[in-house]
Swiss-Prot record:
Subcellular location: Nucleus; Nucleus speckle
Family recorded in the similarity comment: Belongs to the SAP domain-containing ribonucleoprotein family.
Modified residues (Phosphoserine): 163
Limits of the SAP domain: 8-42
Modified sites of kind N6-acetyllysine: 10, 142
Record protein name field: SAP domain-containing ribonucleoprotein
Stated role: Binds both single-stranded and double-stranded DNA with higher affinity for the single-stranded form. Specifically binds to scaffold/matrix attachment region DNA. Also binds single-stranded RNA. Enhances RNA unwinding activity of DDX39A. May participate in important transcriptional or translational control of cell growth, metabolism and carcinogenesis. Component of the TREX complex which is thought to couple mRNA transcription, processing and nuclear export, and specifically associates with spliced mRNA and not with unspliced pre-mRNA.
Gene (name only): SARNP
Modified residues (N-acetylalanine): 2
Subunit description: Interacts with DDX39A. Interacts with FUS. Interacts (via the C-terminal domain) with DDX39B; the interaction is direct and facilitates RNA binding of DDX39B. Component of the transcription/export (TREX) complex at least composed of ALYREF/THOC4, DDX39B, SARNP/CIP29, CHTOP and the THO subcomplex; TREX seems to have dynamic structure involving ATP-dependent remodeling; in the complex interacts directly with DDX39B in a ATP-dependent manner which bridges it to ALYREF/THOC4.
Biased segments, Acidic residues type: 45-64
Region (Disordered): 45-86, 161-210
Protein's UniProt keywords contain Transcription: yes
SMART domains assigned: SAP (SM00513)
């Protein structure tokens, strides 16, 4: 405080007035009055600054003694692997296509006629039904297979498919009629040989074979 009073005494009147204005004090009076005002102001504020330093010191001590809380890392739940295994099973089941269904799709792709038995087998394999043919259906399926073979052969050699199918149907009807009336269909008799020769000639004329 002694040094401050010495400094205030060294100041001029104009400088003392500026110091009073800076601190919000009155500038009226002589030099000695201004010095007293400034000294009283400095003493009051010196006590306040000391109190503030004490308070700030207490706060810093509390901050230093307060423990630092580290953030606790939450444990992540394990990933579910059940769904992945189930998806793999589904993919494996769908990839196994029955062989009969493959044959049917291949026949449709290349425009090859599929027999009735293969269609039934594919359908039975798709729906899980036993594909055991009955006695009544076994005899009817044979001419269908032969007819399909004739159609394939006719398409291969560029022949008329409708005429071949009609010829096979006529032969089948004639065969059934002979079986019904007990007519022998062996090639030993002369009548049967003439019939076969006539059929051969008609067939050659129909397809333009010399």
């Amino acid at each position: 405080m002694a040094t401050e009073t010495v400094e205030l005494h060294k100041l001029k009147l104009a400088e003392l007035k500026q110091e009073c204005l800076a601190r919000g004090l009155e500038t009226k009076g002589i030099k000695q009055d201004l010095i007293h005002r400034l000294q009283a102001y400095l003493e009051e504020h010196a006590e306040e600054e000391a109190n503030e330093e004490d308070v700030l010191g207490d706060e810093t001590e509390e901050e230093e003694t307060k423990p630092i809380e580290l953030p606790v890392k939450e444990e992540e739940p394990p990933e579910k692997t059940v769904d992945v295994a189930a998806e793999k099973k589904v993919v494996k089941i769908t990839s196994e296509i029955p062989q009969t269904e493959r044959m049917q799709k291949r026949a449709e792709r290349f425009n090859v006629p599929v027999s009735l038995e293969s269609k039934k087998a594919a359908r039975a394999a798709r729906f899980g039904i036993s594909s055991v043919p009955t006695k009544g259906l076994s005899s009817d399926n044979k001419p269908m297979v032969n007819l399909d073979k004739l159609k394939e052969r006719a398409q291969r050699f560029g022949l008329n498919v409708s005429s071949i199918s009609r010829k096979s149907e006529d032969d089948e009807k004639l065969k059934k009629r002979k079986e019904r009336f007990g007519i022998v269909t062996s090639s030993a008799g002369t009548g049967t040989t003439e019939d076969t020769e006539a059929k051969k000639r008609k067939r050659a004329e129909r397809f333009g074979i010399a």
